[in-house]
Structure formats: structure tokens, C-alpha cells
Regions:
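C-terminal effector/interaction modules appended to NTPase cores
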Residues: 1-169
Length: 169
């Protein structure tokens, strides 16, 4: 709402909401999911991937766990570099660990050091700096991701964040 103090994450900078525009008309407040333009009372570093919050404390992490579906013809190996698209943020990242592969016929967790096309696994991913994220179950937009191969620019995997609790800021 106009007059509220908000925080831009991940920078932590605060400002007061001076004006809200909804469909080019001034409004006193905005609601979740509404496309809006917000004018602040001072200049704040806000760019694609930043999250504006009021009162809540969003999670930030540079490491997280995600359940991914491997879609690339080239097998996945630990240490592979990607561009990670998470929420509205695009950031370099690396797959650091495969906790287990999920057998799609039995649901069994199977030890794995790589993945082939159409296999699903729980993996650990590290990005180059802390980003705002949440589990998919808690916040769909901040919990879904795509992994893009940095050489071929092809979509290699899609997935959902399953665990940030170990890495909370």
C-alpha cells in the first residue's frame, strides 16, 4: 500500500512506497499476482529477479536442493555448469551433488553419479551469489527452475526447489 516501507531483496535496501499504478491508474494498494508499477520515495537497486517484500522475511540461498527432470540427450554429470532460471532470476550455477535418482517404476531412491534423458533425481545446486527462493510447495514462482546448458543454450532440465532450510540466510 502507499506509505508502506518495503525491502528490496537480495540487497536489503528499504524505501517507502510513494505511488502505485495498476493498469496506468493510481491505486492505494496492490495484491498478490497483480501487474503493477511502483514508485518509491528514493532510488533503490531493483532489477530483474529482485523481490520486494513488506514485513515477511524471504529466503535467500546460494545452495539448495531441487528435484529435476533431465531432458538433455547428453547425460548429466556432477560438476556441470548451467544458467539457472529460478523465479525471475537468471544466474550461473553448478550441479554439485546427486543425492539419488528416482526409479520411475517403483519410486525407489537409487544411488547415482549421473542422469540420462528422462531420469528424475534429487540434486544439490550452487549458484554464484545468494538469490531469493523458496520451496515449490510454499511459493510456486520462487520454487520452479530451468537449467540451461551454457554452451549449447539448450534447456537441459526443469525442476522444483525442495529444500532451502539447510542453507537459509
Amino acid at each position: 500500500a502507499v506509505g508502506d516501507t518495503i525491502t528490496s531483496q537480495p540487497s536489503g535496501e528499504q524505501a517507502e512506497v510513494k505511488k502505485i499504478l495498476v493498469a496506468d491508474h493510481e491505486a492505494e494498494s496492490a495484491f498478490k499476482g497483480q501487474p503493477v508499477t511502483i514508485q518509491l520515495n528514493r532510488e533503490v537497486d531493483v532489477s530483474r529477479g529482485c523481490v520486494l517484500e513488506k514485513g515477511s522475511h524471504v529466503r535467500q540461498a546460494a545452495n539448495f536442493k531441487a528435484e529435476i527432470l533431465w531432458m538433455d540427450d547428453v547425460p548429466l554429470s556432477i560438476g556441470k555448469n548451467f544458467m539457472v532460471f529460478l523465479g525471475t532470476k537468471k544466474i550461473p550455477g553448478i550441479l554439485t551433488k546427486i543425492d539419488y535418482r528416482i526409479d520411475i517404476n517403483t519410486g525407489e531412491h537409487v544411488e547415482a553419479t549421473g542422469l540420462k534423458k528422462n531420469e528424475i533425481a534429487l540434486c544439490e545446486i550452487a549458484v554464484t551469489e545468494p538469490i531469493v527462493l523458496d520451496t515449490f510447495d510454499h511459493h510456486r514462482t520462487q520454487g520452479e527452475l530451468i537449467l540451461i546448458d551454457r554452451i549449447s543454450n539448450m534447456t537441459s532440465a526443469c525442476g522444483v526447489v525442495t529444500d532451502t532450510s539447510v542453507y537459509d540466510k
